Amino acid sequence: MDFLNKKIQKILFICILSFLIVNLTKSEISEVKDVSKFLSVGGGGTGGCQHPIYCNGTLLKTIQLTQVFNDSKTFVDMPMRTSIENVNELFNQLLLNTSKNGGPNKEELAAFLSENFYPAGYEVEPVTPVDWVPNPSFLDEITDPNLVDFARSIHGKWLELTRVFNTSGLCDGCYSSIPVNNPFVIAGSRFREFYYWDSYWIIQGLLVSDMTTTAKGMLRNFGDMITEFGFIPNGGRIYYLNRSQPPLFTQMVNKYFEATNGSDIEFLQEILPILDQEYQWWMTHRTTELTNGETGESVILNLYNVSNNSPRPESYYEDFTDAQSFSSVEEKDYFYSSIASGAESGWDFSSRWMSPSDNTNLTTIQTVDVVPVDLNSILYLNEKILSSFHRTLGNNSMAVYYQAQSESRVDAMQQVFFNEDTYQWNDYNLKTSTNNEAWYTSNILPLFADIQSSIDMDNQEIDLIFKSLANVLIAYPGGVPTSLISAQSLQWDGLNVWPPLQYWIIESIMTPNTTFSNMIGKNLIDRWITTNFCGWNSTLESEGGMMFEKYNANYIGVPGGGGEYVVQNGFGWTNGVDLYLLKKYGKSITLNSC
């Protein structure tokens, strides 16, 4: 069908949103250190960071474009030893003293930073989680002794990855971190702070490890973010305050509620208005209206759309350099907005967001004009969960509201995304008015959200999906590739195998519970756990057992590659996915040969 894009010009559901905001009492708002002095109200519903050191200004531009560090993120994670005013005064003096030579060189800038800044991550401290125990009960659910050792090692990594922000010895505004009240688990390596969507899998792993106190503390942190900013930022740094990430908070709360057997009603009562508030943010600031050219019917779906007209501070050099491909301010602004929106998607970056005519070239990025299948699948599941939560608390009118929202979304997704020939769901491009029919793991994510129960898709039709994808789902020893498009600069493509996507693929396959889908799912679970186990085992003596951020589909136990930084170890979401699978399927997992 032919759809024409219309930008939403009015605030949706304003009455409900106003009610929710008014009824957030002070008792529900935790104390967090104020960072509002460095925020301004930006487009797209976020308060963009205006910090003169970490987000804007000559100092940031000079440091990043000189490439004092190989990784642009290093500088913006370095706390200041003295006030903003002093740092700027000293920097201006440096510029004056070196003006005859064309400005400071890399060595002079490095010396300036050493004198006036602490090392990156100085204010982030390890902490021992209060609820960690050496022998969690889930280990009894695993049959293979090798996998028991593997699981115990992963469980032990929570001790290595749990952090707190400690800014007590730093001056006001002298750091980029967003302080929170409770300990949190980081991803690892360069990712020194908490991240929004990573935490969905981290929290699942914590719940498997019986660490409900730590998990609940992280949920409270996110609730505080929504109360403070209206949404959950990409991560725990002020330079992330112009964007969010895939909205998985509602599903995190649901996982906690399930793990505690629905007993923590008091917490649900506390957090539900905040979940409502986040939902309304996404429905107010991240929507597009599409009209059916044949029937005139309009539908509303969500997309990533960050208002941004400058390089991301943590990737300043890369963004600035790429933007030089454009001659006009309008083109650069579109690029910067789409780059930030690609980061908001979590898939930073993928051919999904590129121009169909040149989909391996990052400078063709057009994320703001792509309506994604996975985002709308996430929100569909959120709507069903929110309806259930409100029904649990006796809020029948809100339960009916969310049920209606989910039904409207299913109808819209079927109209806009569904391919009747392949039985897959494909992203929709607003510029070309066409669907992207290439294979991506996101193509079957609606099955994870159990859309099949709402559209009367029978088991035979579901099996047709998996049979048509058998060459992708079972052909690679290291797991299911993100796409079949190869581009070295696009890490969310090609042969990279990402833990969150493997989780979603496995759950999408296992949710329908057909004989064929269960067979395919079992095969994939075995391959995925094998590649993680082998990567861990081969580095056990030298590195203590490495858990990578991503893996290579072609090889067992080998990390993936590409993108803006080297492959990372740790790793929060890998640990969470593996613990979840080891508990759920631990009695039946078969390790393949390394």
Curated annotation (Swiss-Prot):
Signal peptide bounds: 1-27
Membership in a protein family: Belongs to the glycosyl hydrolase 37 family.
EC primary class: hydrolase
Glycosylation sites: 56, 70, 97, 166, 242, 261, 305, 361, 395, 513, 537
Active site per UniProt: 348, 549
SUPFAM superfamilies reported in the protein's UniProt record: Six-hairpin glycosidases
Listed PANTHER family: TREHALASE
One Pfam family, short name: Trehalase
A GO MF term: alpha,alpha-trehalase activity
Binding site for substrate: 190, 197-198, 234, 243-245, 312-314, 346, 564
Domain of life: Eukaryota
Gene Ontology terms describing biological process: trehalose catabolic process
Keyword presence, Zinc: no
Keywords: Glycoprotein, Glycosidase, Hydrolase, Signal
Protein name according to UniProt: Trehalase
InterPro entries for this protein: 6-hairpin_glycosidase_sf, 6hp_glycosidase-like_sf, Glyco_hydro_37
Catalytic activity entry: alpha,alpha-trehalose + H2O = alpha-D-glucose + beta-D-glucose
Classification of source organism: Eukaryota, Amoebozoa, Evosea, Eumycetozoa, Dictyostelia
Source organism: Dictyostelium discoideum
Hydrolase keyword on record: yes
